[in-house]
């Protein structure tokens, strides 16, 4: 009896086949739970590898679960390779907690690029936020020296962009310069997903279409929502992957669509917690992903990108 073909390989879609290596929680939406479903709604075949499997995210009083190590990741990749299943158009990575696991992911990227040289690697370099690291310091060096050169698109927040470039971002010009520094190191697309300057929240995006050329840069002013949510960075990076692949020459349009989805989802989440009688400012909130399917598929763009000259 012959093995039937994998239809996502035999009949590839016009979107792509994504390998997403991120965390997983049984309850709630962070990591792969935030990324896989939206990408599937946008038409992608997504194969998740769960770097951890926890009962819930670590913001709860307790959590239980397992952590995947580098050898176990290699075992999964070897299983795919043995069955000729290693052709992917995209790899997506998020939170990674150890140098050894990150080094193994780099080996995986190189192996996948040997199968598909046009592989797009989208990396959310999750290291910390608001001036605080929540990964070991040695990971910063690995991201800067090894990961950034391999990435096709990078989606740091303000703090992470500062750690990767050594540049303090105190103005829009600093944000644009940080993007240029990152372009010089590797990725053609950089989106600093959240920057706070003078109390104003914005996103700065940059697309260098050819090495040596001046990048096309833009900003989107973002409405602050008075609450803290989990899983939003994972969702944002997945949406940027999804829309930037559909609009490869218009990163600003991709960012508009991603931001619009996220804003609508966060407003719904906030409203639903209020309807349930819960004070949404008292702790981090689980996002209403399933209830926001239409906003993922067909976002209404309310916040427009403004291109820098």
UniProtKB/Swiss-Prot annotation:
Instruction: Give the residues the record marks as binding ATP.
Output: 124, 157-160, 193-194, 225-227, 232
Record: residues binding Na(+): 124, 155, 193
* InterPro entries, alphabetized: PM/HMP-P_kinase-1, PyrdxlKinase, Ribokinase-like
PTM-bearing positions, type N-acetylthreonine: 2
Q: Which GO terms describe its biological process?
A: hyperosmotic salinity response; pyridoxal 5'-phosphate salvage; pyridoxine biosynthetic process; trichoblast differentiation
Top EC class for this record: transferase
What the record says about the induction of its expression is: Both long and short transcripts are down-regulated in roots but not in shoots by NaCl and abscisic acid treatment. Under cold stress, the expression of the short transcript is increased while the long one becomes undetectable.
| Keywords from the UniProt entry | Acetylation, ATP-binding, Kinase, Magnesium, Metal-binding, Nucleotide-binding, Pyridoxal phosphate, Sodium, Transferase, Zinc
Binding residues for pyridoxal 5'-phosphate, per the UniProt record?
58, 233-234
Please give the CDD domains that the UniProt record associates with this protein.
pyridoxal_pyridoxamine_kinase
GO molecular-function annotation terms? ATP binding; metal ion binding; pyridoxal kinase activity
Effect of pH on activity = Optimum pH is 6.0. Active from pH 4.5 to 10.5.
Q: Which cofactor does it need?
A: Zn(2+)
Cofactor comment: Divalent metal cations. Zn(2+) >> Co(2+) > Mg(2+) > Mn(2+) > Ca(2+).
| Pathway in which the depicted protein is active | Cofactor metabolism; pyridoxal 5'-phosphate salvage; pyridoxal 5'-phosphate from pyridoxal: step 1/1
Q: Which reaction does it catalyse?
A: pyridoxal + ATP = pyridoxal 5'-phosphate + ADP + H(+)
Active site residues according to the UniProt entry:
234 (proton acceptor)
Top-level taxonomic group = Eukaryota
- Name the organs or tissues of expression: Expressed ubiquitously in leaves, stems, roots, flowers and siliques. Present in root hairs and other tip-growing cells such as papillar cells on the top of stigma.
Binding positions for pyridoxal? 23, 58
Work out whether the entry's keyword set contains Transmembrane: no
Describe its function.
Catalyzes the transfer of a phosphate group from ATP to the 5-hydroxylmethyl group of pyridoxal to form the biologically active pyridoxal phosphate, an active form of vitamin B6. Required for Na(+) and K(+) homeostasis and for salt tolerance. Involved in root hair development, both for initiation and tip growth.
The UniProt family comment states: Belongs to the pyridoxine kinase family.
Q: Which PANTHER family match?
A: PYRIDOXAL KINASE
Q: How does it assemble?
A: Homodimer.
Q: What is this protein called?
A: Pyridoxal kinase
Q: Which gene codes for it?
A: PK
């Amino acid at each position: 009896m012959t093995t039937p073909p994998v239809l996502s390989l035999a009949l590839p879609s016009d979107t792509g086949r994504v390998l997403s290596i991120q965390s997983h929680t049984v309850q709630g939406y962070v990591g792969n739970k935030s990324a896989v479903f939206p990408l599937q709604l946008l038409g992608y075949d997504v194969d998740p590898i769960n770097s951890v499997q926890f009962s819930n995210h670590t913001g709860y009083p307790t959590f239980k679960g397992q952590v995947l190590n580098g050898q176990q990741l290699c075992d999964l990749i070897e299983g795919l390779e043995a069955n000729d299943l290693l052709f992917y158009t995209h790899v997506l990575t998020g939170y990674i907690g150890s140098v050894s696991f990150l080094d193994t992911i780099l080996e995986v990227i190189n192996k996948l690029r040997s199968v598909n040289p046009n592989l797009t690697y989208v990396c959310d370099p999750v290291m910390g936020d608001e001036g605080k690291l929540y990964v070991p310091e040695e990971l910063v060096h690995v991201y800067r020296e090894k990961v950034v050169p391999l990435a096709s698109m990078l989606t740091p927040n303000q703090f992470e962009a500062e750690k990767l470039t050594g540049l303090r971002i105190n103005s829009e010009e600093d944000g644009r310069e940080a993007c240029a520094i990152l372009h010089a190191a590797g990725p053609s697309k950089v989106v600093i997903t959240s920057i706070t300057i003078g109390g104003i929240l914005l996103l700065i995006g940059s697309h260098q279409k050819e090495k040596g050329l001046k990048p096309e840069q833009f900003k989107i002013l973002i409405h602050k929502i008075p609450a803290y949510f989990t899983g939003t960075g994972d969702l944002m990076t997945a949406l940027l992957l999804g829309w930037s692949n559909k609009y490869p020459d218009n990163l600003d349009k991709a960012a508009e669509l991603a931001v619009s989805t996220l804003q609508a989802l966060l407003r719904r989440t906030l409203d639903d917690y209020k309807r349930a009688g819960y004070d949404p400012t008292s702790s981090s909130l689980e996002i209403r992903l399933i209830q926001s399917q239409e906003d993922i598929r067909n976002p209404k763009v309310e916040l427009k990108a403004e291109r820098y000259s």
